[in-house]
């Protein structure tokens, strides 16, 4: 049998007869973070997502020397950066719920290809963009990026950390399954080892660690919402143990992280629900949720501890248990917390056509419960726990009346005196494997003017009034982080946390990266204007 070795390559190749085997010898690797945004997970600065941390942990397990850089930092120093000193480069990116970002510019696969075009080592792709579902930075559109994915040697369709582990263990691309998912038992080591990467982030220590509690969704029992990738990727919920989550947070906290979002799940109120594999709207497991958050507080003293998603149907249909969960979140989390409700539509025809399940009555009840339990103002200047509402357009069954129905329900919420922290309005993307088709998108294009009209109407007639209710004039917002200088006498900043308010700060002598206390003096449509309070004795809490 003819055996030949080719060694003048960053990827050593062995040819055995007619077979070509690529042998991996990775001593040094780079993680290039192009950011991620998914239905149940965020990895755009100021957040550091789970993908780079877990990938770092898998590489560290095999004693690989790992560097980490964000795409924004890489663009700054690209001319001086020698990529060929690495045996492997792991690129992370992908968007299933694209948004607008104040101080970050995510990468695309096309950009990654242009960066690595002359790179000789192993090229690995991870994150949502590596999956069959695709990625989109723009609502209502999705591009065919298969030609860019083909550029990479390894495309982690499953879990990036699992693929990296197998690659390093086996030493050969041909022996690994790019579709493999990791178990929570093996994830524990990756998560704890990967905590070290936070110190390599250019914004350290001012970053928020996104923490995973579970993935999958009870809605998978009937296929899930028509547009959503979560149940299609992960099926029914698989829960992470409280101890594993707490231990990861302890390590991250000891590495200097003081900001956390327990955000990588479709519904915080459904964590460890006993009937999650039998019921689409499972009863909250109050004991498990208290064990988790109490445990987090026992090992850390975070400046920010927030959540993300919550299913309003769970809150409304299990009122007693949900009130207890909300009280736990108020007790252990910091104020300014937001439970994002995936309402998507108040139109019952759209709800039925897209298997959304949650009714308008569910939403109104859930909004009422969180306002009653979480509406008191806390030390940050914001209420402890408020709902957010996500609305999605371009769904099946959408009609002209849908826009009016959605607006009327938002108006009812306002007229009843409730507070909503944010209203997120976006267009659906036809991801692979979901029930949304290009035909649905083309139909939605015909209603583009209606969509823009609706968005403008909500911003003018709901958002502005709601801001004045959530943060009345005179409210002091503590620890606003100065991020951008717009002009000589105007800066923009935000507090750390879930869905922070954009604050325009009227001042001439601020520094980017400093924290200031700001008094609310005026309002934009979705932002506020404030002035710095420098005399601590003048600080008071409004409401």
From Swiss-Prot:
Name of the protein in question: Uncharacterized protein MJ0274
Location of the TRAM domain: 470-534
Keywords of the record: 4Fe-4S, Iron, Iron-sulfur, Metal-binding, S-adenosyl-L-methionine
Origin: domain of life: Archaea
Transmembrane segments: none
Gene3D superfamilies from the UniProt entry: tm_1862 like domain
Record's keyword annotation contains S-adenosyl-L-methionine: yes
Gene Ontology molecular function, alphabetical: 4 iron, 4 sulfur cluster binding; catalytic activity; metal ion binding
PANTHER family: PTHR43324, RADICAL SAM CORE DOMAIN-CONTAINING PROTEIN (PTHR43324:SF1)
Domain Radical SAM core as annotated: residue spans: 203-460
A Pfam cross-reference name: Radical_SAM
KW Isomerase (keyword) present: no
């Amino acid at each position: 049998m003819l055996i030949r070795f080719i060694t003048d390559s960053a990827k050593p190749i062995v040819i055995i007869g007619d077979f070509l085997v690529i042998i991996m010898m990775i001593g040094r690797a780079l993680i290039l973070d192009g950011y991620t945004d998914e239905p149940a997970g965020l990895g755009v600065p100021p957040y550091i997502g789970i993908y780079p941390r877990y990938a770092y942990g898998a590489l560290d397990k095999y004693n690989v020397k790992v560097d980490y850089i964000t795409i924004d930092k890489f663009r700054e120093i690209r001319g001086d950066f020698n990529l060929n000193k690495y045996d492997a480069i792991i690129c992370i990116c992908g968007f299933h719920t694209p948004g607008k970002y104040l101080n970050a510019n995510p990468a695309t696969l096309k950009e990654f290809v242009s960066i690595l075009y002359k790179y000789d080592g192993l090229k690995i792709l991870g994150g949502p963009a590596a999956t069959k579902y695709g990625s989109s930075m723009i609502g209502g559109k999705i591009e065919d990026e298969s030609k860019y994915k083909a550029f990479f040697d390894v495309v982690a369709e499953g879990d990036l950390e699992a693929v990296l582990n197998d690659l390093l263990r086996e030493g050969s691309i041909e022996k690994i399954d790019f579709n493999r998912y990791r178990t929570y038992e093996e994830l524990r080591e990756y998560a704890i080892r990967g905590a070290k990467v936070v110190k390599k982030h250019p914004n350290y220590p001012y970053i928020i660690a996104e923490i995973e509690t579970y993935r999958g969704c009870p809605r998978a029992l009937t296929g899930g919402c028509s547009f959503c990738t979560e149940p299609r990727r992960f099926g029914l919920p698989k829960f992470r143990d409280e101890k594993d989550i707490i231990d990861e947070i302890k390590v991250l906290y000891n590495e200097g992280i003081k900001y956390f979002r327990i955000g990588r799940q479709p519904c915080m109120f459904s964590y460890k629900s006993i009937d999650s594999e039998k019921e689409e709207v499972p009863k909250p497991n109050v004991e498990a949720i208290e064990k988790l958050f109490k445990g987090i507080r026992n090992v850390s003293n975070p400046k920010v501890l927030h959540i993300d998603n919550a299913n309003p149907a769970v809150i409304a249909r299990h009122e007693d248990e949900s009130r207890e969960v909300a009280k736990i979140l108020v007790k252990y989390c910091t104020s300014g917390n937001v439970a994002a409700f995936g309402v998507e539509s108040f139109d019952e025809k759209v709800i039925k056509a897209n298997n959304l399940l949650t009714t308008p009555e569910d939403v109104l009840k859930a909004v009422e419960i969180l306002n009653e339990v979480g509406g008191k103002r806390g030390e940050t200047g914001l209420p402890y726990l408020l709902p957010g509402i996500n609305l999605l357009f371009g769904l099946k069954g959408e009609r002209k009346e849908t826009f009016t129905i959605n607006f009327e329900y938002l108006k009812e919420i306002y007229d009843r005196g409730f507070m909503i922290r944010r209203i997120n309005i976006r267009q659906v993307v036809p991801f692979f494997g979901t029930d949304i088709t290009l035909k649905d998108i083309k139909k939605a294009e015909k209603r583009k003017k209606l969509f823009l009209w609706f968005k403008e109407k909500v911003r003018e007639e709901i958002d502005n009034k709601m801001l004045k209710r959530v943060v009345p004039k005179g409210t002091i917002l503590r620890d606003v982080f100065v991020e951008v200088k717009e002009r000589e006498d105007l800066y923009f900043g935000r507090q750390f946390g879930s869905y922070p308010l954009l604050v325009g700060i009227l001042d001439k002598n601020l520094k980017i990266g400093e924290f200031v206390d700001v008094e609310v003096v005026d309002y934009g449509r979705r932002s506020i204007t404030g002035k710095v309070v420098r005399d601590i004795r003048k600080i008071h809490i409004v409401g």
